Each structure stands twice: as C-alpha cells, then as structure tokens.
Curated annotation (Swiss-Prot):
One of its GO terms (cellular component) is M band. The modification Phosphothreonine is found at T6, T26. This is Myosin-binding protein H. Gene3D superfamilies: Immunoglobulins. Residues 1-73 are annotated as: Disordered. It comes from Homo sapiens. Binds to myosin; probably involved in interaction with thick myofilaments in the A-band. One of its GO terms (biological process) is sarcomere organization. Residues 172-260, 382-466 form the Ig-like C2-type domain. GO terms for molecular function: structural constituent of muscle. PANTHER family: STRETCHIN-MLCK, ISOFORM U (PTHR13817:SF171), TITIN (PTHR13817). InterPro entries: FN3_dom, FN3_sf, Ig-like_dom, Ig-like_dom_sf, Ig-like_fold, Ig_I-set, Ig_sub, Ig_sub2. Residues 73-168, 269-364 form the Fibronectin type-III domain.
Amino acid sequence: MMEKNTSEGPACSPEETASESAKVPTAEPPGEVAVSESTREEQVPKPQAPAPQAPTASTATKPAPPSEDVPSAPLLLTLDDVSSSSVTVSWEPPERLGRLGLQGYVLELCREGASEWVPVSARPMMVTQQTVRNLALGDKFLLRVSAVSSAGAGPPAMLDQPIHIRENIEAPKIRVPRHLRQTYIRQVGETVNLQIPFQGKPKPQATWTHNGHALDSQRVSMRTGDQDSILFIRSAQRSDSGRYELTVRVEDLEAKAVIDILVIEKPGPPSSIRLLDVWGCNAALQWTPPQDTGNTELLGYMVQKADKKTGQWFTVLERYHPTTCTISDLIIGNSYSFRVFSENLCGLSTSATVTKELAHIQKADIAAKPKGFIERDFSEAPSFTQPLADHTSTPGYSTQLFCSVRASPKPKIIWMKNKMEIQGNPKYRALSEQGVCTLEIRKPSPFDSGVYTCKAINVLGEASVDCRLEVKASAAH
C-alpha cells in the first residue's frame, strides 16, 4: 500500500507542470505560443511582431515518460485451467515496477480473426491470477497481460499459443452389464437386444464390428445415444454368432468392450444306431454322434425302449454321454426296439434314430428241480391270549365284553351266563373276527348281573375264560 500510495501521489504532476507552463507568461518573444490542451488558449490572437520562431520540443509536445517510470512485462504468464466456459491464467510480478509504483494489471484478449485487443476488466486489477468467464464453446483467442503504473502500461506478456474453448474431455468408459460378461446365448428366431451404457465427454462416437468386420445393416441395427449404444437383431440366426466389439471414442481416447453371442438350435438325431448283441435279459447298443449339434455342445443322449406288444416308449437313460450302452432287466419272451435322441441346451432333437432289428429276449431252457419240501403243521388247540375282565355297568347303557383267542383250525365260540348258554337271545349280540371275541349286552338291567363265560372249541381241544358283570342301579334322589 505504501508503494501504491507513493505511485498515486505524483500521478498528476507532469500534467500540472505542463499546464502551468502554458499559462504563465515567459520572457520569450510575444509571437511564441505554447501548444496546450485548451482550445481557448489556441484561439488567442497573435501580436504584430517579427516572424515567429519554430516552437521548441519542450513547449510543442507532451514529454514521453522515461522508461524507468513504466513497469516491465509480467513474468511467467501461465495457463492454469480451461473449461467449457472459462479460462484461468496466472503470472508473476514484473522485475521492474517503475519509479511511480504499480497500479495493477490489465488482462486483454483478442479473438481469432480480429485485430482489436479487448480488456477483460474495466480497470487494472491488483491480482496475479484472473479467470475469464462466460465464454462460448468454440471460442479461440489470444491472451496478454500488462503491468500498469501512473506513467502508463508496460510491455505485455503474451501466451505462445491461442486458447480454444471446448468441452471438458472425459475419457470414455464402457460398463458392460453383468449378464453380458459371459457368452450371451439365444435360440434361433429369438430377438437380440443389447443395451450397453458408456460414459465420456464430449459425446462419444460409438462403432460396432462383428468378427472384425462392419455390421450387416440388412440383419443388424445399431442406435447410439448420449449414454448408451443399442444392438438389435429382430430374428437371430446361427450366422449371427460371433464376437461383437463396441468401440467408444472421444477425440484421441477410446474404450473397447467385447461381447460373445452364440445362437443355437436343437441338434439333429444320431447319425446311425446298431444293435450289437443280445444275451439273457440284456441288449447292447452303439450309435454315432449327430452331424449337426445345433451350434453348441451336446448335453448327452436319451435312450428309450419299446415292447413290440404295447408299442409304448419308456426312457432308459437320460443325458448319457458315451455312444455305447447296455440295457438290462428286459422281460423274457418280449421283443424290443430302441431309439436314441440327441440333447443340447435347446432340448431334445426333433426326431430319434431307431434300431432296425428287434432284440428278442429268449426263454432259457432251464428245468426246475425242486427239492423235497416238508409242510409244517400249524394246527393248534384254542388258547386265550387276552382273558375277560370284570366289568361294572349302569342300567340302560349298552356294555361290551372283550377277549382274544388263538386256534387252528378256527374255533367255535360259545357265550354263557352263569354256566347257561345265551346263544339266540336277542338281548345279546356275539361277534368274532381275527381272533377277537366280543359280547354286546344291550341296555342291561340289574337282572343281567352275573358270571359270563367265553368258550372256544375246535377238533384239538377247548378253552374258556370268564368274568363278573355287575349292573348297579342308580341311587334314588
């Protein structure tokens, strides 16, 4: 501030000196008139006198400021940053500030094709870094900066190359979706619709290739937006399989991504099949792989058999990889046909290869020679495995007596009350099933109390069990 104040102090002294010298009369001849900025003074009439002499340099023109009063050019003018709408430059103070001190710096620009230098600010700025804003994309211009003192502006410092305002460059990046990082499989006739996002500034240019060649526009369409590229195939064919490469470019920068597409269909059937051998209940088969695997690996073969009598096919083996097999557990006396399907990711082949010959499972010439067999006698006299149990009942409510007996042949069951048979009495119902004997007494009364006996009789003997039934009358209220 002291330096600035010092430079501002004498800023007007040269002009004041020149003005005063023009107004104060001098000892020079009256014909000599000093040239000044005042029009009025230029119109003063000339006195009658001898011819005037030529004016001296000190009175005719304003003296140029000495070189030591003007600052030198700023140092190290540097371009710090360029964006899509602004530019920032910085510099170092000049080596020589001048005797009158530094008032600031003037930053100017000159657009390409123009000759006029336009100041960025209306007055000098006491800063060594400045940002020019609100620039338009595509602008191209030169920049210079000058140091200014009271005596005037010093020589400028200028950038060597013009500045070009353009979008910030962001290196392109392709973000391949996770499901496309491995082989993308579609079936013949299905739609292929791939959307690949990317990044980059300014707007990247995207191109596709198929196996290193340009895309066939008759089959494949491509659309590129600001942030993604779409590859579309309406009806995929096996010829569309291959390596698709997406290249995204931003000026000299580029990014690439590779997507493998595999278009598949159902395989053809095995080329041939042969019945190798038949023995016992077994048959051996052999076949050759199909000529067309459907543009992908086989998952295996399905082997089926059919009995000549029924004609129904039954699966014997699934996803079987070898080309030979042995089928066992065939039924003696039947004749069998065999067929084989091929299988891949799309499923089974539409047709199968069938054996021309039948496999006849012959009956073996074996005569059975049974050894002597001793038949076991399972006859058994009756015996009770579960006896009758004493029971107490309430009048008017049916009650049941249970026991179980074992005997062979089946025994005859006789029920008795107080040693008297009760067969045929409608009050009682006797049942016997699987050795369990049941006697139901319908709505008993106290008169039905007594000892009940169950007797089992067959040709080998007899057995009996008994119990006591007590029917108690309800107490009177």
